[in-house]
């Protein structure tokens, strides 16, 4: 149970949204805003994501420490995610991002020293990036094998989850495949023929302690240089309008392409070749799994 929280929670309206952060104690976010201004969601995610989001978060961290002096404080600095996905870990842009984050951490340490506040700082990484140059579309594969069903509504192709025998929820280099009973073998055999990494059925998931009740009936991992996209349409003109925008709720999976803006169409790109960094596969060289 946390006593102090600030986390983005925009209020979605009919054709817009109000940027807001949920906070605890009540009105703590509003107090922070008085000192450093509103948290701008477009800095945090989307084609305009930048170090400004991390700067705001570090400044909010300083205010939290100064006003509440918590015993334990977790702060998420998102900046490395942007260059990591757009350019990959081998890029000069990613190295620049590392230096920028290093400066932010240094700034926080200097603040703690100036306040004579004794804190031990532990820096944790959620994941390591892999350089990628390929993308796989599990939902298109299921669609082409008549396992994922779609409906044409207003000239656009939408997934019919009720009638589908299987569909994929994609997240970077991992894809959860949800399958109706009786089709597990068929789906598994289809993906065994694809250029992917591994397939984990429920038995293998249990062995690896990843058999959550919400896990897919099978879980796919990609090859190291590849990642999974959520796309299901085979003709670009049939793609629903929301797929061209930053829309984290209606897409069946994470979409790194939301970091890319197509200047010609003024929309989010569908060009999977733009992504150069991803994560999620098991590092066999450094893992006991």
What are these language model-derived features?
Residues 1-88, 100, 169, 179, ...:
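His/Asp/Glu-rich, glycine-adjacent segments
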Residues 70, 109-119, 197-203:
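Surface-exposed helix-capping loop/turn segments at secondary-structure junctions
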Residues 70-74, 120, 217:
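Residue-level preference for the first positions of well-ordered beta-strands
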Residues 79-82, 127-130, 225:
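Short, internal active-site loops enriched in acidic
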Residues 84, 132-133, 140, 145-151, ...:
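Short helix/loop capping segments that flank catalytic or ligand/cofactor-binding pockets
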Residues 89-94:
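Short glycine-enriched, charge-decorated loop/helix-capping segments at active-site entrances
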Residues 99-143, 147-148, 220:
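Metal-dependent active-site segment of extracytoplasmic phospho-/sulfohydrolases and closely related
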Residues 159-289:
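Active-site neighborhoods of enzymes that stabilize oxyanions during catalysis
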């Amino acid at each position: 149970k946390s006593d102090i929280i600030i986390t983005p929670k925009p209020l979605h309206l009919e054709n817009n949204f109000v940027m807001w952060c949920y906070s605890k104690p009540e009105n703590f976010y509003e107090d922070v805003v008085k000192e450093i201004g509103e948290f701008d969601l477009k800095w945090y995610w989307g084609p305009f994501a930048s170090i400004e989001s991390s700067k705001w978060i570090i400044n909010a961290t300083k205010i939290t420490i100064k006003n509440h002096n918590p015993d334990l404080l977790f702060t998420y600095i998102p900046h490395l995610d942007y260059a990591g996905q757009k350019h990959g870990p081998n890029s000069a842009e990613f190295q620049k991002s590392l230096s920028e984050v290093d400066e932010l951490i240094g700034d926080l340490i200097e603040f703690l020293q100036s306040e004579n506040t004794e804190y031990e700082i532990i820096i944790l990484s959620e994941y390591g990036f892999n350089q990628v140059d390929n993308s796989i579309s599990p939902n298109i594969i299921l669609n082409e094998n008549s396992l994922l069903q779609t409906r044409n509504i207003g000239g656009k192709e939408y997934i019919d989850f009720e009638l589908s025998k299987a569909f994929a929820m994609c997240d970077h280099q991992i894809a959860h495949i949800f399958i109706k009973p009786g089709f597990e073998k068929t789906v598994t055999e289809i993906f065994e023929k694809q250029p992917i990494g591994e397939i984990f059925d429920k038995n293998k998931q249990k062995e690896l302690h990843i058999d959550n009740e919400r896990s897919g009936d099978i879980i796919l991992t990609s090859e190291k240089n590849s990642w999974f996209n959520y796309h299901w349409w085979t003709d670009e003109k049939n793609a629903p309008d929301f797929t061209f925008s930053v829309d984290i709720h209606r897409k069946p999976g994470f979409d790194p392409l939301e970091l890319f803006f197509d200047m010609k169409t003024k929309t989010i790109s569908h060009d999977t070749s733009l992504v150069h960094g991803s994560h999620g596969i098991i590092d066999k060289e450094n893992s006991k799994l």
